């Protein structure tokens, strides 16, 4: 019998990746960024070219951002939402300095003109290591700013497979209110569902006590990609390396995920391959 089930077209996947130094994953600010602000920042970071050494003024069409709805087409709303980023400095961990995401932002006739803050050059340009990388679609699919922040924290640690943080520190990075643990658990359960349904990550979490009181949150993290997909991505990465494109295309996310599933090729473990790729990348 002929299958008459209607095929649902799959959404075209973005081919661009967000790459940022791990210090930018743990930023703290006095005011929480909105989900639209976070998506804008991620999208514009993904537009940085691998060989760029400076932050020129660039432009992007509002309609090309991939997360704009009818409400966002309103100029007044857009100006209030995005230009507010110029007034939202954050502290860079392990640096101690305050920075804004942008030194220049302008919106005119559906076009955003922007330039990143030059103080962010060491954290966004010519990265050799200690960075997190993921496909842009992961954050574009999320619906809350808290889900985006937690997704990045988990991606940073996906190669290790776990993340343990003090609850107090976690709340500061997430910019969450001072929830009691019971309410925090319920809230995290909602965020967990959102992340698992919309990104490449699967994870669980639990509170860890010190004495009689819970002091830490422990996340256990897995990549949802199939073994077959990971092997295919590893082969693609190897071909790119063969063609001399290691600086442009070195995909830490793919290799770490492959290590996690213990895929091996030509009797050499991917852990060793990853180490070799690091050495190649550091020489660029």
Task: Show where each model-derived region lies.
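Charged, alpha-helix-forming regions
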Residues: 1-283
């Amino acid at each position: 019998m002929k299958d008459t089930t209607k095929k649902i077209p799959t959404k075209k996947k973005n081919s661009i990746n967000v790459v940022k130094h791990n210090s930018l994953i743990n930023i703290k600010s006095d005011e929480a960024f909105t989900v639209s602000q976070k998506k804008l920042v991620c999208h514009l970071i993904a537009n940085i070219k691998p060989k760029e050494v400076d932050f020129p003024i660039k432009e992007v069409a509002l309609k090309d951002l991939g997360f704009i709805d009818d409400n966002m087409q309103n100029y007044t709303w857009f100006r209030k939402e995005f230009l507010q980023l110029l007034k939202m400095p954050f502290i860079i961990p392990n640096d101690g300095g305050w920075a804004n995401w942008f030194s220049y932002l302008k919106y005119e006739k559906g076009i955003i003109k922007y330039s990143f803050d030059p103080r962010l050059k060491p954290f966004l340009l010519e990265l050799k290591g200690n960075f997190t990388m993921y496909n842009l679609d992961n954050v574009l699919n999320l619906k809350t700013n808290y889900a985006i922040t937690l997704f990045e924290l988990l991606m940073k640690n996906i190669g290790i497979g776990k993340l343990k943080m003090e609850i107090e520190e976690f709340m500061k990075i997430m910019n969450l209110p001072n929830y009691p643990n019971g309410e925090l658990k319920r809230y995290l359960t909602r965020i967990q569902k959102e992340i698992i349904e919309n990104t490449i990550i699967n994870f669980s979490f639990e509170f860890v006590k010190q004495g009689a009181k819970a002091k830490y949150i422990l996340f256990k993290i897995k990549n949802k990609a199939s073994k077959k997909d990971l092997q295919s991505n590893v082969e693609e990465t190897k071909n790119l390396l063969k063609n001399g494109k290691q600086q442009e295309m070195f995909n830490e996310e793919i290799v770490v995920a492959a290590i996690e599933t213990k895929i091996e090729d030509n009797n050499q473990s991917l852990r060793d391959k990853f180490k070799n790729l690091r050495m190649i990348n550091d020489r660029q």
